[in-house]
Each structure stands twice: as structure tokens, then as C-alpha cells.
């Protein structure tokens, strides 16, 4: 019980003799001043006046009636007829009615009669303020005039409180508290919480209780400095708002000073904590009343003190702040509330009685009421109190339950200072601080559990959470999905895949990171595992495409569009964002956080393998994880100098690092028939711990035909599509993680017409991968090339790798395991991974039909790069990147975000710096066939990637060229003196018709593949030279075809691929008198040292490095380690599919970069270089059937 409770519950006993009232000796007699004394003590008074307030007793003591309202509370019998007789019969009648009403109301105090001074409020239907007001009414003496005046005021007070109680019954306490603090803040004040507010007020009192005058700034700084150890959130702003609250309550005496801040001195009446706190609380209550808020004393006590022990304190404040007009306003307010709720309890019947009570004058000096007015008032108050009790018992939603204090994250999370310093706490069990170590730990643990709870959250576009996620330390279960956008929603069993899947789980170090992971997956899509994959176009992607969702990728350990069966897989579906006018690029996985445990180096051999798949064909099954062996999660090791923040980690196991495909990829928009069934069945996973390959929906993956000692690599390049940087923005090694398997594909909108004539052996039912994502990524990088590109002839010849016939060549290009260690730590920008072309001639061709009738910028077949820098038609290229450019213009650059920063004047830092160096060769190997036969580059014209200019034209970005130098550097001899240039502007072109000769192509492919066994044994220097050998063989083939000159130039642009292979030279444009054999010997260095470079001419991205001095061929040799990048003047390598008018100068940063040796089969791809003369009028003659024509 509150301390002050006994002051008003002792009305059942005599305040003089302290004896409980009874019906015999200690009969209660009420005086006109509302004090009730037993008759024995009253007879002992020396003078007829109240012993407490000395109010004169006008009526004879023997005439004063016994207060039977109080007697019935102590169990006495109330007589039916009392002996009191008033002056006239009319007054007696009104008196009896009024007395009866009071006695009836007193019955609501019956639970208080359990014993002397003992009150049990729990069984009462009335609130404590109502009980206190009712006790005041019961103690009124109706016989005396003053008593009747007091009774009228008590009746009015009861009626007013009844209205307030009824309004409170219709309010939402949570909404009420929010409105209260909003009103407080609107007045420049602030309440910091019960504990912190108390400490702040005590510190203000400590600073000013001695009468000192301080400026507001000094006072605030003092309080903040003292609060910071216990409340780190204390700030000058918040404490300033507390001081403003006291200032508004007129607690300070302000002294103004000229040209200086005013001094504040605490008024004398507020130099104690109780007085200061009461004025503080009264100011908050006053603000609430100004805002029209009705808050019960219980709520006030909970809000301001964090307990329920200050209800009486708050009620007294409320009562003092009540105005005579507030009653009438409350009645109107109640009427409005009842109209809104429909008034199920018919409370409108109380309105006349409430209005009668509101009209009573609350002034103590008011005129005495008549007996009729007294009767009417007593009847009215009895009616409204009965109505309130009836509503609480029958219609109240919350009943008469004490409101529980709202949970506070700081509740009992620190030790009580009073207990520590003084050995005891005056608040006792109501203290909001812990009083023992056990209590402290208990509430801290409870807060942690509350914070760890995952609540369901609404997703965009009606996406809901199907299951509540319980976060554990072992896994993250993502069950986020949308039945609207995805056909199926499957909960994951171990965070990523099925229970039988042995792929490691995503380990969360804390619940916070788990929540962030779930939040990120919520925004992006769903990760589920139900053993299903999207095979070809699915209804899911069609549905999602309708609502404009981001590209979505079937993520699986096998080929996503594999026609064969697949049992285990995961699917990542992006959640659509309807508000976005374009395809949004958001991190698929959680952002970089130190709370998330990532994976180790994927290059290292790990002791477990990915789950086993149904084996069909001749591929051996991968080993499985033994039972009981915990799966190990590899961690991706980044280069030492790469900023950690710039490389958001891939936070899923390596088998799930797939690119996301546009839903266009899987729609039935392809003009071709569906692909034939896969002859090999499901693809076994990569057992080495590296990334499993990403597959586009138009091809079937075939694993490599060879096996290395250290690792089995798949045919993969970094995916071109919409993989975000935070998914796969790791070191250079990880970006080009063994350039096999990942490959880039250009994309064509499904609606564009196609003019391709597929080969008979190549059923092109390939679904096109959308390139809108990577298109929108680099508008500015392409911008500088648009102005110089001529319209190119599109090659739409489909690839042969989708064919069910296996003889299609398989070229696997791989980097050594220590590739990333040899590179420097320059930050790798995100979009590089999405534009790299495959170097496998067997797989690249599937991309050739991506952009219909569009210029093909480059041919990158079998590790050789032919660069297109010289086309001038802007319009032909513009719409390819229109979406990207529009998106970038709308998307402002955020300097320190994880997204790329790209200047509107061009891609300055999007590519890797020249610091990435490697000495490792790029080895192309294949095993098929036994004979060796030179193959013209025309044989591989169909295998062209529409976005392979990533390997080419971007080389003329001075700051990003080394990105390609490290792959595409070739040592070639300056062919300028050994070739004759065409005097016309005709370009070399190749008819597409000759490429349709399937038997010839297959035979040449088989012969090319036969070179693997022979060339694998060559050392690193031989790889360089053999690469050039293949190029020279093509020169020789071109020379033999000199008779074919003009036929290919007449073909339609959509039907042929123009092969532009030019050796550019600015010094000797007219000398090709030396034999090709001599040039070949010079280039290959066969006549001399094998470990020396030949002509000293390094081709950067296929560009020959400028020779600054002319020496005999044998004097031009330089070692591999001395290869430096020299600025080129106007040297390019012209692509097969390019039709151009002028070269684009390439500026390569000066850095020491060792070339990557590419071992290519003879004739696989012939790299021809041509140095443009100053007048830019020398071009090569057309080529027929891969043979070069020399004029």
C-alpha cells in the first residue's frame, strides 16, 4: 500500500481516539466540515467546534444524525427509520432521499471494511480516485448548511471523474502515451524516461539548490557530464529539453544580462526534490491537458515513475489542474466518443445527469443549495456512478486491471545507486534498478531474448513471411517468399539447401547479423531448397516478369536449365519492387559485416565435397561427406591490399554463387525450338571447393575433358548477368576463378526480330539471357566508343555446344592456383565480373545471337582477343545501353556506398588497375582428334560474344587497361614491314555461308583439339610463341586465298561476319616483301632462344606495343620479366565482327605487367594486327573462307 493511503482509509475509525466506529459506543457523527468523530469523543469537547479545523458546530450534538453510511461499512445494522426530524416535512423528505443515495454509494466502499486501516482495493469496481471522492461525499453532514455545500461539490467532483473514467475506458493507452510525448516534444521539452529523468532533476537540484545562478549552457553541461557514465545517451540537446520543461514550469528566477546569456536561479520553493518533481510532473500533466489527452493516474504513475506507487500523487496534481470548464468539455468529449463507438452500454442516458452535475458551482463560497437541488444532485451522482460501474463490469474491454508498466530495455539492467551507496533503496521492489547480481543478470538475459526474437515483417508487393524464423547460432533459415511473384515458397532446412545437401551452412555469429541477413533476403528474394530447379522457362519467371521484378536466377548445384533430372537445388527469386521503374540492383546476400562468418579460400582443397547427384553419362561421381563430419565453410581470401569494405563478401557457400538471370531468359520468347535433352544428365558439382559454374539458360554445361593434379575445374568465367558486387566482389583471383565455366553472355530483348539461320546441327532453342542488367551498369564506359564505331554486321550464327552431339570442342582456360597472389591489391570494381567473355570456343557461340542485328564488338575465341575500337555509328549502339544510361542518370552517386562510383565523363575507376600482374599462362587445352591441322579464324566466327569488348575496347581506358593486359597480352612481331596494305577502305569480311559447312567445322575443331596433348608439354615461353604461331598460320591461309577478293563484301550485313584482322603500323605501311616464313621465325623465336620474347613487341589486349627503335629481329628479343606496358599511339586489333572507319587510340598505363601466355590450338584463332597509317586509308582486303587476300 502507498504510504499516504492510511490518511484516507482511516475514515472508518475515530481520528481522536482511534477506535473503529461501531453502532453502540463509537457511533460516527459527521460535522459540517466533513470531519467524522465518534459520539464519545464529540461529547468530551470543551467547545462546540471541530477539534481539527476549529469550525463551529451550529447544530446541537445530540441532534446531529449518526452516519449510517459509515456504519454499514463496518458491519453494523442500519435502522429503517432514524430519529432525526427536520423543521418541516418537505425538507425531511428531500433529506431522506439524499441520505439514501449516499448510503447506496457508500456500498462501493464495502471492500475497505476488512479491518481497521486495512484497504483491499482489488475487489472494488471503482478506481482509487473515485473511491477517494466517494469517501469525501460520505463524510458530508447533510443536516448542516456547510455540509450540504460540500456534498454538492463532492457530487460534482464524482460526476466529473466519472466522465473521465468513461473516456479512459474508450482510449488506447499505447496511442495515448505516444500522443503525450509528441505533445511534450512539440513544446520543446522532453521526458527521458523514469530513471534518467529522475537523475537529471537531481543533478539540476544539486547544481542550483544552494541558490547559485548559472547560465543554461553551464547547467546543461554539468548535468550531461555527470550523467554520461551511467547514461551514455545523454546529450546536451536532451538535457536542454529537460531544463526547458522546468523553465516552462516557472521553476527558475531568470536574471538577464546584456550581451550575455541569462542566469537561472532555482526558486526557493523548489529547492527540494519533492517540490521540484511535483512541479515538473504538473507541467507534463498540463501539457497533456492542453493537448486534450485524458490519462488516468495509474497511467501517469507508470509513465513518469515506471511503477504504480505514485497514482495518488498524480491524482492530486490532476485535481489541482482541473478547471470549472473542464467538466462540460469532458461531457462533450464523451458524447463524441459514444457516437464513434455506437454506445453499446447506452451511456447517453447519463448525459442529463452529467450536465446537471456540471452546472454545480465548485466555488467554496457558492450559495447554499436548496434541499431539492441537493436531492437532485445526489440522485444524479448515484445514477452516473452506477452507470460507470455497470459499464466497467459488463462492457469494458480491459476491465479494472492495473496497467502493467511497459517493458523497458533499461529496466533493472544496472545496479541501484542508492542501494550501493546508502545500503538501502527507498523505492524498494518498485525500483527500476537491480538490487542484486541475480536480478541484474536475469533482466539482462531477458532483454537479450527479447532482442533476439524475429518478428514477422511485411514484404514488398504483398510478400509475406510464411514461417516465423527462429534464429540459432548454427543456421539462418530463410522462409521469405511471395506467393504472388513466385510459384512456390519452400522453407530451407539448413539455411541454404536441403538437409541432405552437405553444402555448408551460413554460420551466424550473433542474432543481429542473423536479423540483418534475413532483412536483406527479405528485400531481395527468397532462398529455398526443395530439390527443384527451374527447367527452361517457368511460370514463376513469367509471373514475375509481369510485375517488373528484378532479374531472377535459378540457383542450383546443377545447370539451372538442365533438361536432366535434378534432385537438390536452391532457387533464388528476387522480390519485385513495384516502385522501381527499372531493374534494381540490390545485394543478394547480406552486406559485409564483421558479425558474419565467411568462407575460406575457394582455391584450397577442402575435406568435403558438394552433394552427390544422379550420375548419367561417363562422369565420375564426386565424393560425399562422411557421416558425422561437420561441413567446412571455405573463406575467400582477398588480396592483402584490397580494401575490405570495398569487397562485400559472398555469404553463401561456393556452390550457390551463381549469377541471377533475367526472367526474360526463361520465357518462351525464343524463336527457336526448345533445346534437346541433355545427353550427359545432371552435371556433377565441382568437388574442389571453388565456385560451381553458372549456366545460362541456353546451353548445357559439359565438364572439362581433362583433369589437373591439384584441382578439377569447371568451364566457368565470371557471370555476365546481374550478380551484384556484394555477392562476388572479391579479389582478382575470385573474379576470374579459373576462367572456365563462368562466361558472359550478351542479351537480346525477346521482342527483337532475328535474322539468323542456325546451322542444321545446332538446334538453337536457347533462351536468351537478358543483358539489360549489365547494359545499365556501364553507360559511360561505352560512351567514348559510341562516337567512333561504325555499324557492324551482326553474326547470329548459333553455337554448336547446345547440340546433343558431343563432338563440339571443349576449351578449358585456367589460371594457376596462385593467380591472385601475384596480383596487387587494387580494388576490383563490381561490374567487371559481368562483362567477361568466355575463352572457350565451344561455349562462347551461344552468346552470338544475343543482340540481334547489332554490331558485335569483339571476337574472343580460344583465349585470343580481337578488339573492335573503330566503329563510328552511334545510333546502332546507343539503344543497347539506353536502359543502363537512363538508370545511371537517375541514380546519384553515393561516394562511400558499396556500389560502383562512375564518372559521367567515363568509367575512370571501374576496371582493375595495372597493379594486377601475373606470370602465369592462360592455358587452353582440349583433347579431341589426333591430327593437327591449321584452322582459319573464320571457322570460329560463329562463336562471338556480343559483349567481348570488355576484353578489347576497354583497353584504351588509361586507368583500367591492365584489367585486360593481364589476360590479353601477347608478344607479337611487328608485321608492318612484311605486309602490303590495301589502298582502299574495304574491310576484310567473311561470309557466314562457309561457316555452315558442318563437316568442315567439325573436322577442323577435332584437329584443333588434337593439339592439346602436344602443347601441354610446352613450357611457358612456348605458350607465347605457339599462340603467335597460330596467328601466322592464319596469315598464311589468308595469303593462299588471294583470289577471293570481293564476294564477301556484297553479302547482307545480317548474314555475314566481317573479319577485320589488321596489323597496324605507323612506320612502314607498305612493306610486305619479306617471306612469311621469315616473319614466322622471327615471331616465334624458333631459330634462337626459346625463353626469349621475339620481337620485343608486347600486345596489350591484342594491341602491339609501340617499338621505339628498329633493330634486327634477333636484337628485339627481350625476356618475359622485362615486358613493360608502353603507351601505344594508334594501334588496335580489329574484331572479326567489326566494321570500322578509324582506329581508336589505346592508352595503357605504364606498369610492369607480365603477360599471360595463352596456349591455343593451331588455327584456333589467328590474331592479325595492323598499324593504321597516319592517313587512315590502309585496310586489308576481304577474306574468303578464312583465307587472307594480299594486294
Curated annotation (Swiss-Prot):
Cross-referenced SMART domains, in alphabetical order? RING, ZnF_C3H1
UniProt-annotated location(s): Cytoplasm, P-body
Q: How is its activity regulated?
A: Binding to dsRNA, but not CDE RNA, crosstalks with the E3 ubiquitin ligase activity and may inhibit ubiquitination.
Any one GO CC term of this protein is:
membrane
Per UniProt, where does Zn(2+) 1 bind? 14, 17, 38
Q: In which pathway does it act?
A: Protein modification; protein ubiquitination
Main localization, broad class: cytoplasm
Location of the region described as HEPN-C in the Swiss-Prot/TrEMBL record:
326-396
Superkingdom in the source lineage: Eukaryota
Q: Zinc finger regions (RING-type), where?
A: 14-54
Gene Ontology process terms (BP): B cell homeostasis; limb development; lung alveolus development; lymph node development; multicellular organism growth; negative regulation of T-helper 17 cell differentiation; nuclear-transcribed mRNA catabolic process, deadenylation-dependent decay; positive regulation of non-canonical NF-kappaB signal transduction
User: What InterPro entries does the database record attribute to this sequence?
Assistant: ROQ_II, Roquin_1_2-like_ROQ, Roquin_domain, Znf_CCCH, Znf_CCCH_sf, Znf_RING, Znf_RING/FYVE/PHD, Znf_RING_CS
PTM (free text): Proteolytically cleaved after Arg-509 and Arg-585 by MALT1 in activated CD4(+) T cells; cleavage at Arg-509 and Arg-585 is critical for promoting RC3H1 degradation in response to T-cell receptor (TCR) stimulation, and hence is necessary for prolonging the stability of a set of mRNAs controlling Th17 cell differentiation.
Task: Extract the ranges annotated as region (ROQ).
Answer: 171-325
Tell whether Metal-binding is among the UniProt keywords: yes
Q: Where is this region: HEPN-N?
A: 91-170
Q: Which UniProt keywords apply?
A: Cytoplasm, Metal-binding, Phosphoprotein, Repressor, RNA-binding, Transferase, Ubl conjugation pathway, Zinc, Zinc-finger
Q: What class of enzyme is it?
A: transferase
| Tissue expression from the record | Expressed in spleen, testis, ovary and small intestine.
Q: Name one Pfam family in it.
A: ROQ_II
Can you tell me which residues bind Zn(2+) 2?
A: 33, 35, 50, 53
Its recorded reaction(s) are: S-ubiquitinyl-[E2 ubiquitin-conjugating enzyme]-L-cysteine + [acceptor protein]-L-lysine = [E2 ubiquitin-conjugating enzyme]-L-cysteine + N(6)-ubiquitinyl-[acceptor protein]-L-lysine
Q: Where are the zinc fingers (C3H1-type)?
A: 410-438
Function of the protein: Post-transcriptional repressor of mRNAs containing a conserved stem loop motif, called constitutive decay element (CDE), which is often located in the 3'-UTR, as in HMGXB3, ICOS, IER3, NFKBID, NFKBIZ, PPP1R10, TNF and in many more mRNAs. Binds to CDE and promotes mRNA deadenylation and degradation. This process does not involve miRNAs. In follicular helper T (Tfh) cells, represses of ICOS and TNFRSF4 expression, thus preventing spontaneous Tfh cell differentiation, germinal center B-cell differentiation in the absence of immunization and autoimmunity.
Write the protein's name.
Roquin-2
Q: Which organism is it from?
A: Homo sapiens
Q: What is the lineage of its organism?
A: Eukaryota, Metazoa, Chordata, Craniata, Vertebrata
Amino acid at each position: 500500500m502507498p504510504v499516504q493511503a492510511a490518511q484516507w482509509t482511516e475514515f472508518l475509525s475515530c481520528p481522536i481516539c482511534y477506535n473503529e466506529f461501531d453502532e453502540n459506543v463509537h457511533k460516527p457523527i459527521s460535522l459540517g466540515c466533513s470531519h467524522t468523530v465518534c459520539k464519545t469523543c464529540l461529547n468530551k469537547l470543551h467547545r462546540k467546534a471541530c477539534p481539527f479545523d476549529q469550525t463551529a458546530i451550529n447544530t446541537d450534538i445530540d441532534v446531529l444524525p449518526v452516519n449510517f453510511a459509515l456504519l454499514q461499512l463496518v458491519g453494523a445494522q442500519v435502522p429503517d427509520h432514524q430519529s432525526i426530524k427536520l423543521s418541516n416535512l418537505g425538507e425531511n423528505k428531500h433529506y431522506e432521499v439524499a441520505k439514501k443515495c449516499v448510503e447506496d454509494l457508500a456500498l462501493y466502499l464495502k471492500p475497505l471494511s476488512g479491518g481497521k486501516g486495512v484497504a483491499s482495493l482489488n475487489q472494488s469496481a471503482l478506481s482509487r480516485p473515485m473511491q477517494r471522492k466517494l469517501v469525501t461525499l460520505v463524510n458530508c453532514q447533510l443536516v448542516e448548511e456547510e455540509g450540504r455545500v460540500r456534498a454538492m461539490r463532492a457530487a460534482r467532483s464524482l460526476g466529473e471523474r466519472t466522465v473521465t473514467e468513461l473516456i479512459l475506458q474508450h482510449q488506447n493507452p499505447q496511442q495515448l502515451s505516444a500522443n503525450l510525448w509528441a505533445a511534450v516534444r512539440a513544446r520543446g521539452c522532453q521526458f527521458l524516461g523514469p530513471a534518467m529523468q529522475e537523475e537529471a532533476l537531481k543533478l539540476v537540484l544539486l547544481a542550483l539548490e544552494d541558490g547559485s545562478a548559472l547560465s543554461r549552457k553551464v547547467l546543461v553541461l554539468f548535468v550531461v557530464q555527470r550523467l554520461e557514465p551511467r547514461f551514455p545517451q545523454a546529450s546536451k540537446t536532451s538535457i536542454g529539453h529537460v531544463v526547458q520543461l522546468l523553465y516552462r514550469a516557472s521553476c527558475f528566477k531568470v536574471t538577464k544580462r546584456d550581451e550575455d546569456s541569462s542566469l537561472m536561479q532555482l526558486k526557493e520553493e523548489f529547492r527540494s526534490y519533492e517540490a521540484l518533481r511535483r512541479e515538473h510532473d504538473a507541467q507534463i500533466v498540463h501539457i497533456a491537458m492542453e493537448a486534450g489527452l485524458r490519462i488516468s493516474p495509474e497511467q501517469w504513475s507508470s509513465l513518469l515513475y515506471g511503477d504504480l506507487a505514485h497514482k495518488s500523487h498524480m491524482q492530486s496534481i490532476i485535481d489541482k489542474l482541473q478547471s470549472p470548464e473542464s467538466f462540460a468539455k469532458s461531457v462533450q468529449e464523451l458524447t463524441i466518443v459514444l457516437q464513434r463507438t455506437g454506445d453499446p452500454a447506452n451511456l447517453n442516458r447519463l448525459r442529463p445527469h452529467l450536465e446537471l452535475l456540471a452546472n454545480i458551482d465548485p466555488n467554496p463560497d457558492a450559495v447554499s443549495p436548496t434541499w431539492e437541488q441537493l436531492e437532485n444532485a445526489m440522485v444524479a451522482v448515484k445514477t452516473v456512478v452506477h452507470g460507470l460501474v455497470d459499464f466497467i463490469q459488463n462492457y469494458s474491454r480491459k476491465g479494472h486491471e492495473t496497467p502493467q508498466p511497459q517493458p523497458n530495455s533499461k529496466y533493472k539492467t544496472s545496479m541501484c545507486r542508492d542501494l550501493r551507496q546508502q545500503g538501502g533503496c527507498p523505492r524498494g521492489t518498485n525500483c527500476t534498478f537491480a538490487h542484486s547480481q541475480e536480478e541484474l543478470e536475469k533482466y539482462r538475459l531477458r532483454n537479450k531474448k527479447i532482442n533476439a526474437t524475429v518478428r514477422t515483417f511485411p514484404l514488398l508487393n504483398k510478400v509475406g513471411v510464411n514461417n516465423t524464423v527462429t534464429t540459432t547460432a548454427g543456421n539462418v533459415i530463410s522462409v521469405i517468399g511471395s506467393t504472388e511473384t513466385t510459384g512456390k515458397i519452400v522453407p530451407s532446412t539448413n539455411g541454404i539447401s536441403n538437409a541432405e545437401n552437405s553444402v555448408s551452412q551460413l554460420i551466424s555469429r550473433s542474432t543481429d547479423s542473423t536479423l540483418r541477413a534475413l532483412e536483406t533476403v527479405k528485400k531481395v528474394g527468397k532462398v529455398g531448397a526443395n530439390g527443384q530447379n527451374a527447367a527452361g522457362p517457368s511460370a514463376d519467371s513469367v509471373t514475375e516478369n509481369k510485375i517488373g521484378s528484378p532479374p531472377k536466377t535459378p540457383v542450383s548445384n546443377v545447370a539451372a536449365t538442365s533438361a536432366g533430372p535434378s534432385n537438390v537445388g536452391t532457387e533464388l527469386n528476387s522480390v519485385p519492387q513495384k516502385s522501381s521503374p527499372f531493374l534494381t540492383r540490390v545485394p543478394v546476400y547480406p552486406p559485409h559485416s564483421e558479425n558474419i562468418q565467411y568462407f575460406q579460400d575457394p582455391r584450397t582443397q577442402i575435406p568435403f565435397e558438394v552433394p552427390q547427384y544422379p550420375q548419367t553419362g561417363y562422369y565420375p561421381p564426386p565424393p560425399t561427406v562422411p557421416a558425422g563430419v561437420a561441413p567446412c565453410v571455405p573463406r575467400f581470401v582477398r588480396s592483402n591490399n584490397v580494401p575490405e569494405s570495398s569487397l562485400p563478401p559472398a555469404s553463401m557457400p561456393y556452390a550457390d554463387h551463381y549469377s541471377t538471370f533475367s526472367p526474360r531468359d526463361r520465357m518462351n520468347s525464343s524463336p527457336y525450338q526448345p533445346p534437346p535433352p541433355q545427353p550427359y544428365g545432371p552435371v556433377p558439382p565441382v568437388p574442389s571447393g571453388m565456385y560451381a559454374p553458372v549456366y545460362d539458360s541456353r546451353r548445357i554445361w559439359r565438364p572439362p575433358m581433362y583433369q589437373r593434379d591439384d584441382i578439377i575445374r569447371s568451364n566457368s568465367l565470371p557471370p555476365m548477368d546481374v550478380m551484384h558486387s556484394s555477392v562476388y566482389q572479391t579479389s582478382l583471383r575470385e573474379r576470374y576463378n579459373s576462367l572456365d565455366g563462368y562466361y558472359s553472355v550478351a542479351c537480346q530483348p525477346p521482342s527483337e526480330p532475328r535474322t539468323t539461320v542456325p546451322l542444321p546441327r545446332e538446334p538453337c532453342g536457347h533462351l536468351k539471357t537478358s543483358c539489360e542488367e549489365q547494359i545499365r551498369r556501364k553507360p559511360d564506359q561505352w560512351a567514348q566508343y559510341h562516337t567512333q564505331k561504325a555499324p557492324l554486321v551482326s553474326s547470329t550464327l548459333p553455337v554448336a555446344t547446345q547440340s546433343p552431339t558431343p563432338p563440339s570442342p571443349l576449351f578449358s582456360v585456367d589460371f594457376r592456383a596462385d593467380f591472385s597472389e601475384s596480383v596487387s591489391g587494387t580494388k576490383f570494381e563490381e561490374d567487371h565480373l559481368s562483362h567477361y567473355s568466355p575463352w572457350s570456343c565451344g561455349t562462347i557461340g551461344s552468346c552470338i545471337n544475343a543482340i540481334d542485328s547489332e554490331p558485335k564488338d569483339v571476337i574472343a575465341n580460344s583465349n585470343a582477343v580481337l578488339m573492335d575500337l573503330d566503329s563510328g555509328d552511334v545510333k546502332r549502339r546507343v539503344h543497347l545501353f539506353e536502359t543502363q544510361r537512363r538508370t545511371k542518370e537517375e541514380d546519384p552517386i553515393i561516394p562511400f556506398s558499396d556500389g560502383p562510383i562512375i564518372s559521367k565523363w567515363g568509367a575512370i575507376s571501374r576496371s582493375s588497375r595495372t597493379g594486377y600482374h601475373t606470370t602465369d599462362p592462360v592455358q587452353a587445352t582440349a583433347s579431341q582428334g589426333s591430327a593437327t591441322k591449321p584452322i582459319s579464324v573464320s571457322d570460329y566466327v560463329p562463336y562471338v560474344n556480343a559483349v567481348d569488348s570488355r576484353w578489347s575496347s576497354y583497353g584504351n581506358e588509361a586507368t583500367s587497361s591492365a584489367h585486360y593486359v593481364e589476360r590479353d597480352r601477347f608478344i607479337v612481331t611487328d608485321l608492318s614491314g612484311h605486309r602490303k596494305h590495301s589502298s582502299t577502305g574495304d574491310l576484310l569480311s567473311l561470309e557466314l555461308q562457309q561457316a555452315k559447312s558442318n563437316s568442315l567445322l567439325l573436322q577442323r575443331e577435332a584437329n584443333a583439339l588434337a593439339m592439346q596433348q602436344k602443347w601441354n608439354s610446352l613450357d611457358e615461353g612456348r605458350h607465347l610463341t605457339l599462340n603467335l604461331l597460330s596467328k601466322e598460320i592464319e596469315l598464311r591461309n589468308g595469303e593462299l586465298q588471294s583470289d577471293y577478293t570481293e564476294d564477301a563484301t556484297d553479302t547482307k550485313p545480317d548474314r555475314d561476319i566481317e573479319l577485320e584482322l589488321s596489323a597496324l603500323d605507323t612506320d612502314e605501311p607498305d612493306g610486305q616483301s619479306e617471306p612469311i616464313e621469315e616473319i614466322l621465325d622471327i615471331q616465334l623465336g624458333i631459330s634462337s632462344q626459346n625463353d626469349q620474347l621475339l620481337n620485343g613487341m608486347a600486345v596489350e589486349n591484342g594491341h602491339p606495343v609501340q617499338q621505339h627503335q628498329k633493330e634486327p629481329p634477333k636484337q628485339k628479343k627481350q625476356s618475359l620479366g622485362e615486358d613493360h606496358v608502353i603507351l601505344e599511339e594508334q594501334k588496335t586489333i580489329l574484331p572479326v565482327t567489326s566494321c570500322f572507319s578509324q582506329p581508336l587510340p589505346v592508352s595503357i598505363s605504364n606498369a610492369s605487367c607480365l603477360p599471360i601466355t595463352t596456349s591455343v590450338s593451331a588455327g584456333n584463332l589467328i590474331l592479325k594486327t595492323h598499324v593504321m597509317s597516319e592517313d587512315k586509308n590502309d585496310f586489308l582486303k576481304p577474306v574468303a573462307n578464312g583465307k587472307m587476300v594480299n594486294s
